[in-house]
């Protein structure tokens, strides 16, 4: 841990006097704070604490060679209700009894997220950071973050994006993945109206349209020397097409609210790619 970010630190409650060597750090108190110390140990093992450590350690830059426990222990802790303390104590006892992490991990993370009052969007940010971003930063180009997402993942992303678009009150939207080709994926957001969409007569934008604008740039998009993630936002009549590489890292559900804001901005400014010009 002291040389680079190998894994997340862990916290344990020790119910007796102890001394610590270099590499260990402790919070100590008398027996009157026994319950609170146990609860704090649970909080420090939660996804929120891991997110805090990942975001504050800044261990990916060349300027940092060592990590310190105090960065992890600096996590601000809000007041705990008696009910929350009881929930955390139950988790600590179950873990101390040797139960598998899978049996208590979800309850721990949910309880601590409630303690901090995280919104659903904020919880998704934490989840994406500890899965997709953590994998990406740790494993580089070999990370599963650069693999193609399954269809059900795009369905979840599309549902989140549609929710944020509808909340903008600029019409009701249908959102779906409409194309996956040439190493890209295209998410289409279409405003509902009284006229039914007709694929045979309505304009159809495709990933090929975008690529054909400048075929010479394709080599740079798929460079083997670095990771390139180009994207395009195309206004096409009543539809908006969001095009990115077909990689998990490019379609994190936690970014769907920002994507909705970018779509709204494009609608306001009227930056449009004309399909007829692209075809030419």
Model feature map: region roles:
Residues 78-280:
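Non-catalytic DNA-recognition/assembly elements of restriction-modification systems
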Residues 17-20, 33, 37, 68-70, ...:
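Active-site-proximal structural scaffolding
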Residues 3-20, 38, 42, 49-63, ...:
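Short, ligand-facing micro-motifs at secondary-structure edges
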Residues 3-5, 28-31, 44, 76-79, ...:
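Active-site proximal loops enriched in glycine and acidic residues that flank catalytic Cys/His/Asp
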Residues 9-13, 35-39, 51-55, 83-87, ...:
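Extended hydrophobic-aromatic, low-complexity segments
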Residues 22-74, 81-84, 251-280:
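Basic, amphipathic alpha-helical recognition segments used for DNA target recognition
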């Amino acid at each position: 841990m002291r040389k680079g970010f190998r894994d997340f630190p862990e916290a344990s409650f020790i119910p007796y006097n102890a001394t610590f060597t270099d590499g260990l750090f402790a919070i100590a108190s008398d027996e009157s704070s026994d319950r609170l110390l146990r609860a704090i140990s649970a909080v420090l093992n939660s996804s929120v604490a891991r997110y805090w450590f990942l975001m504050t350690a800044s261990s990916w830059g060349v300027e940092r060679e060592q990590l310190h426990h105090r960065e992890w222990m600096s996590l601000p802790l809000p007041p705990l209700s008696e009910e929350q303390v009881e929930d955390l104590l139950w988790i600590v006892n179950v873990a101390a009894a040797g139960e598998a992490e899978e049996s208590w991990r979800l309850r721990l993370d949910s309880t601590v997220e409630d303690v901090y009052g995280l919104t659903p969007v904020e919880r998704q940010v934490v989840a994406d950071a500890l899965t997709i971003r953590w994998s990406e930063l740790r494993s580089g180009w070999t990370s599963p973050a650069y693999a193609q997402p399954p269809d059900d993942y795009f369905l979840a992303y599309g549902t989140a994006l549609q929710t944020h678009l509808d909340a903008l009150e600029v019409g009701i939207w249908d959102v779906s993945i409409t194309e996956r080709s040439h190493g890209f994926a295209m998410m289409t957001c279409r405003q509902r109206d009284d006229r039914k969409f007709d694929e045979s007569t309505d304009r159809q934008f495709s990933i090929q349209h975008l690529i054909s604008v400048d075929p010479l740039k394709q080599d740079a998009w798929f460079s083997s020397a670095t990771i390139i993630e180009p994207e395009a936002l195309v206004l096409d009549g009543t539809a908006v097409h969001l095009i990115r590489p077909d990689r998990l890292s490019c379609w994190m559900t936690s970014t769907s609210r920002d994507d909705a804001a970018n779509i709204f901005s494009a609608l306001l400014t009227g930056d449009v790619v004309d399909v007829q010009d692209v075809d030419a």
